[in-house]
């Protein structure tokens, strides 16, 4: 059977995985990176998700640098399996949960990409004074360029705000709803302005969930 391994490199992604991943019967990791591999019976296009180089300052001290997560699927993608000795930290990879490989209930490709985008947007989270515009602009992109409904956008932005320790997270709860009703919708240019990067950089991140500039 074909397997999909969701390889988590940035620990921030684990917080979103706990929220949205649902049931997974096969999880492994190692002491320096526990619960970093989720495995299902499935087939997906393999992809590595990395922050573009002009955002490197946000992950300067991360153990895996710009790499956030990776979808490993197919025989060409090598995964260190439980029982193996990890070459970098000289520690054994071990199962943390193993009850066989289950099929994912729902759209696995969508949820893995959603987790990865949320991870990036949380790592890049705006400083105080710019957070409301940042969240409003994220909502604008998702309203205009995805098929997500208001409830999903509302939850996505609220959870990013919560995990980013935004003390006004409650005020971000209805961003999808309000963005859809707004006469003027902010989008990628506003996010790029806040983060002081190019619009194409932001477009790259949102392309992970199928949104294009």
Regions found by a protein language model. Give the residues of each.
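DNA replication initiation modules
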Residues: 1-14, 18, 40-164, 191-212
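Short secondary-structure junctions
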Residues: 20-24
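Short beta-strand
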Residues: 25-33
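Short alpha-helical segments used as structural interaction elements across diverse proteins
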Residues: 27, 69, 128, 169-172, ...
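Residue-level signal for threonine
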Residues: 31, 187, 201
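Beta-rich nucleic-acid/ligand-interaction surfaces
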Residues: 32-40
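Charged/polar, low-hydrophobicity segments characteristic of intrinsically disordered regions
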Residues: 163-191
């Amino acid at each position: 059977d074909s397997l999909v391994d969701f390889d988590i490199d940035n620990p921030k992604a684990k917080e979103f995985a706990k929220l949205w991943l649902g049931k997974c019967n096969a999880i492994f990791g190692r002491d320096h990176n526990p619960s970093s591999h989720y495995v299902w019976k499935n087939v997906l296009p393999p992809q590595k998700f990395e922050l573009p180089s002009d955002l490197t300052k946000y992950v300067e001290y991360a153990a895996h640098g710009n790499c956030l997560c990776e979808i490993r699927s197919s025989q060409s993608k090598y995964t260190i399996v439980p029982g193996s000795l990890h070459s970098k930290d000289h520690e054994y990879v071990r199962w943390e949960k193993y009850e066989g490989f289950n099929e994912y209930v729902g759209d696995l490709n969508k949820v893995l990409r959603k987790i990865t985008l949320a991870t990036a947007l949380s790592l890049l989270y705006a400083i105080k004074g710019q957070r409301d515009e940042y969240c409003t602009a994220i909502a604008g992109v998702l309203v205009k360029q995805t098929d997500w409904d208001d409830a999903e956008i509302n939850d996505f932005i609220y959870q990013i705000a919560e995990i980013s320790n935004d003390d006004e997270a409650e005020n971000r709860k209805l961003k999808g709803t309000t963005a859809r009703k707004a006469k003027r919708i902010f989008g990628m240019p506003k996010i790029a302005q806040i983060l002081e990067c190019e619009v194409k950089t932001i477009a790259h991140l949102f392309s992970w969930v199928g949104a294009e500039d």
